């Protein structure tokens, strides 16, 4: 399977849990899907496959920006990095969703955080964390 096809499949796989959290946050199907952790686990396995497949073959490193650039110059390494983003953004979004449900934070407050977490990862997390402190008066 080509990296392009795997990229499209991974992007499609990750949409279901995000849409469930955004559109039907209180539905049983959402609770089942998100609490199973199945989607991030499947993507993590895919990530692991590409890491094993490409490890040490790109000539790059994590010690300099130029080294990271060399790492990401290989399509399969870039694909692994993208899957890494998908897994961790989904993990953070699922935490936000669970925490909002547990603390009775309005879905209308949560929704922009989920969208930003999906699109810009840490920005959505930062917004959620700030709103959580504002509404609950506690960071954790």
Locations of the language-model features?
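N-terminal membrane topogenic signal
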Residues: 1-10
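N-terminal signal-anchor/start-transfer transmembrane helix
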Residues: 10-29
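Loop-to-helix transition at the N-terminal end of transmembrane alpha-helices
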Residues: 29-49
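C-terminal TM-helix exit segments that contain a strictly Trp-centered aromatic cap at the helix terminus
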Residues: 47-57, 124-129
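Membrane-helix interface/capping segments
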Residues: 54-77, 90-94, 98
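Hydrophobic alpha-helical transmembrane segments of multi-pass membrane proteins
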Residues: 80-87
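Membrane-helix boundary connector in multi-pass membrane proteins
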Residues: 95-107
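Hydrophobic, aromatic-rich membrane-embedded alpha-helical segments
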Residues: 111-133
């Amino acid at each position: 399977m080509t990296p392009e096809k795997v990229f499209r499949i991974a992007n499609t796989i990750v949409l279901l849990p995000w849409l469930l959290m955004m559109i039907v946050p209180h539905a049983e199907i959402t609770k089942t899907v998100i609490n199973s952790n199945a989607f991030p686990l499947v993507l993590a396995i895919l990530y692991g496959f590409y890491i094993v497949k490409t490890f040490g073959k790109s000539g790059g490193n994590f010690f300099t920006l130029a080294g990271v650039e060399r790492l990401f110059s290989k399509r399969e390494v870039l694909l692994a990095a993208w899957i890494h983003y998908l897994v961790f953004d989904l993990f953070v979004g699922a935490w936000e969703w669970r925490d909002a449900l547990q603390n009775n934070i309005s879905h209308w407050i949560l929704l922009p955080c989920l969208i930003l977490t999906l699109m810009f990862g840490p920005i959505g997390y930062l917004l959620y964390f700030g709103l959580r402190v504002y509404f609950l008066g506690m960071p954790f």
